[in-house]
Design a protein with these regions (language model features):
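Small/polar (Gly/Ser/Thr/Ala-rich) solvent-exposed segments
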Residues: 52, 74-95, 105-132, 152, ...
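Short, charged, amphipathic alpha-helical segments
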Residues: 116-120, 183-191, 388-396
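Amphipathic alpha-helical coiled-coil segments
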Residues: 51-65, 133, 137-158, 167-169, ...
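Bacterial Sec-pathway N-terminal export signals of envelope proteins
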Residues: 33-80, 105-106, 114, 120, ...
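Membrane-embedded beta-strands of outer-membrane beta-barrel proteins
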Residues: 100, 302-304
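N-terminal secretory signal peptides that target proteins for export/translocation
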Residues: 1-14
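Periplasmic alpha-helical coiled-coil/stalk elements that build and connect Gram-negative outer-membrane
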Residues: 11, 35, 133-248, 258, ...
């Protein structure tokens, strides 16, 4: 009875411990379900500082466009005029006044409206840059995730091969003890096993590097296990108009908006050829009486002031020329961006096609041939008709072909992801 009671208690204790361990794992940062590419993209887009920064810039220009179209605040004038300093008697002199007035400045030409339009173009530029930042972020996350997937999958392939090599080491040691093989076979088997361990260590280091790169966008989730399935990307569009896709790209839209904003700077500079003016109205209160005994009349004054842009050679002309050069610079920058995007598209499209051909070659021929060669070498070695060195070369060739097949598939997907940055998926 006592023994049964103890067994029941032990089972309950084990169950409780398992529950505690599972519960603890659920709350460990980085522990969780396998991370898919889609999840990584969504996590990265949640709070990317570049995107948020451009969005804030766009809102700031939008707010500025409202203030840019508003007239300057009017000025209120208060004062005492022509006060006698011997007595400070406001009724002593006929010209003494207490004045109150208001003045309003009016900027040159249509400068307010043009400045508003310029701020609106700058807002559109920042909005487009936010969209471009989103595309770049998704592309960067895809590149890092694909590279991470390669390292994880490559490590699994090497682990499978290591188990085979470990068995071969055991077999050669047994055969050596029985006198059926020489010592060189044992040494070579151990050497190849150590080389596999070295390759695994290098791959593990790269895996950790890509996880750290991914962590800058998604945090501790980057250290989760990743999905075993090969990452799927949106399909590339068929029959795409490349020039239209590039012209409508957010980066080009941002550059184009900058060009339009620079053109508005030219229009603003041209407004300096027009006079700026101001209007003022003031009222003067007078105290005391006239010599005939009547009360002194108050004074009212209305003025219009404006400047005359006579000397334009070294000021207005230079400002217009400066604005024109800035516009040219913005246009050249947009042209360069167009060329860069076209270069990226052409390069990645050719890369994707070449890798697609190589994937077909590996799937249709190389993988099966390498596997058949490996099996044949193993059977031949077991039958005593081939040397151990030939067997090891066949096994290593199969490993290299499997790793290269994985590399080609990942490289094709990487080119695919970079093409999607251009086409917008």
């Amino acid at each position: 009875m006592c023994q049964t009671h103890i067994d029941v208690d032990n089972n309950a204790l084990k169950t409780s411990c398992c529950l505690i361990v599972v519960s603890a794992l659920l709350f460990i940062p980085g522990a969780g379900f396998a991370l898919s590419l889609d999840q990584a993209e969504k996590l990265a887009l949640k709070a990317d500082p570049r995107v948020l920064g451009y969005q804030s810039t766009a809102r700031s220009y939008e707010e500025a466009s409202v203030s840019d179209s508003t007239l300057p605040d009017p000025r209120l004038m208060l004062g005492a005029v022509n006060v006698p300093v011997d007595s400070f008697d406001l009724s002593q002199e006929a010209m003494t006044q207490l004045k109150v007035g208001i003045q309003q400045d009016f900027p040159r030409g249509s400068s307010l409206e043009i400045k508003q339009q310029q701020s609106q173009w700058l807002s559109r530029s920042a909005t487009a840059l936010a969209q471009d930042a989103r595309r770049k972020l998704v592309s960067d996350v895809r590149q890092a995730y694909l590279n991470l997937y390669y390292e994880v999958a490559a490590l699994e392939i090497i682990s499978e091969t290591r188990r085979l090599f470990s068995n071969l080491v055991s077999i050669t040691e047994s055969n050596y003890a029985a006198g059926r093989v020489n010592q060189q076979d044992v040494v070579q088997a151990s050497l190849e096993l150590s080389r596999l361990d070295d390759r695994a260590a290098k791959i593990k280091g790269k895996e950790e590097g890509y996880r750290a790169e991914l962590a800058q966008w998604i945090g501790d989730q980057a250290w989760n296990p990743i999905d075993d399935m090969f990452p799927l990307l949106p399909e590339l569009p068929e029959d795409i108009d490349v020039n239209a896709a590039i012209t409508s790209h957010p980066l080009i839209q941002a550059k184009n908006a900058r060009v339009n904003a620079a053109r508005k700077s030219i229009d603003i500079a041209k407004q300096d050829y027009k006079p700026g003016w101001s209007a003022s109205l003031d009222y003067g209160f007078r105290s005391g009486d006239n010599p005939d005994g009547s009360s002194r009349s108050d004074f009212a004054t209305a003025l219009v002031n404006f400047d005359i842009p006579l000397f334009t050679t070294d000021r207005q002309d230079r400002r217009v020329a400066s604005s024109q050069e800035k516009t040219n610079a913005a246009r050249y920058e947009m042209d360069d961006a167009l060329r860069q995007l076209k270069r990226i598209y052409d390069k990645e499209l050719h890369s994707w096609r070449r890798h697609n051909e190589r994937v077909s070659l590996y799937q249709d021929s190389l993988l099966a041939s390498a596997k058949d060669n490996s099996r044949a070498s193993l059977q031949a070695y077991q039958s005593g008709v081939t040397e151990f060195n030939t067997l090891m070369r066949a096994q290593i060739t199969e490993l290299d072909v499997r790793l290269e097949n994985l590399r080609v598939k990942v490289d094709r997907a990487s080119a695919h992801a970079r093409l999607l940055y251009i086409t917008g998926e």
